[in-house]
Amino acid sequence: MDSSIFCGGIPALMTPANADHTPNTAGLVKKGQDLIAAGMNAVVYCGSMGDWPLLTDDQRQSGVTALTEAGVPVIVGTGAVNTRTAVAHAEHAQQVGAKGLMVIPRLLSRGTSPAAQRDHFAAILSAAPELPAVIYNSPYYGFETKADLFFDLRNEFSNLVGFKEFGGADALSYAAEHITSTDETLVLMAGVDTQVFHGFVNCGARGAITGIGNCLPAEVLHYLKLCGQAAEGCATARRHAKELEQALHVLSVFDEGPDLVLYYKYLLVLLGDTDYEHHFNPSDRLSESQRRYAEDQLKLFQPTEPRFGMAMSLSSSPSLWGLK
């Protein structure tokens, strides 16, 4: 089964909220279209970046439908407490023309049971056999999918074509050594912004699900291009990729923490996107010090454009990180 939908840059879409704290579907679609127009290969919706625990199942599926009808290639997240609900999201994804599944482990109930997780994964994969899927591995879920479980599932479900790793460098290295290097058709995805270089250069990752890419798509796409060239042995690209990784570091670290959605929505507002001013829980907000910190870090990353309200002017500094 074709796994190319999981390659390249793939932002995990955030769900914009209206002033009454309901989903702004028009804003969601616009952001998805803008990111694809910028060069992203696909988008993920609805994952943790999309605030899936704060949305109803109907709201999540309405967002998926709106994106697919607008021609945005969507990888659908199956996060749910109940396996039946996860299966319903997978079935809906296939029905409306989504391009792939990001299969999330069973949560809260029997989450540490390998047998329960095996049954959970199998139910989702069998619900949408026409969609290529990756298993999402993350320490936040309290369960680690190892090679034995992955290949037990792959032997039964040909639509399981890859592995997304949100853990750190060691977890990515394990996935490369024991899972995705077994078969060249399997795709490894870097699931956190801080591990993109390690994932691409040292582990053979071919895709990155990104948070900061929602805010700085051109810069992140260039970073991915450099990482890909570095993985092919280009020393100049390797040096430029490391420089850009360091410049992006703090903005990327936001992707690792519990306030990632608050930070990236705030960065979008600073960059002029008013669709992201509101949150679903009115009490969800960054502290004053967090906001100032985010402002300072964005300014630091944008040496050629000190004002907020517009993206970084790359053309005024053509040698910056190897940009042409």
Q: Which residues are covered by each model-predicted region?
A:
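Active-site beta->alpha loop and helix N-cap motifs at the rims of alpha/beta catalytic domains
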Residues: 2-144
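Short alpha-helix boundary/capping motifs
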Residues: 63-64, 71, 95-96, 121-122, ...
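Structured C-terminal cap/extension of enzyme domains
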Residues: 198-324
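Short glycine-rich loop/turn motifs that provide flexible caps or phosphate-binding loops at active sites
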Residues: 7, 46-49, 76-78, 161, ...
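A general structural signal for well-ordered alpha-helical segments in protein cores
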Residues: 28, 60, 64, 86, ...
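A broad structural signal for alpha-helix termini and local helix breaks/kinks
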Residues: 71, 128, 157, 271-272
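Catalytic alpha/beta core domains of metabolic enzymes, predominantly
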Residues: 123-128, 138-257
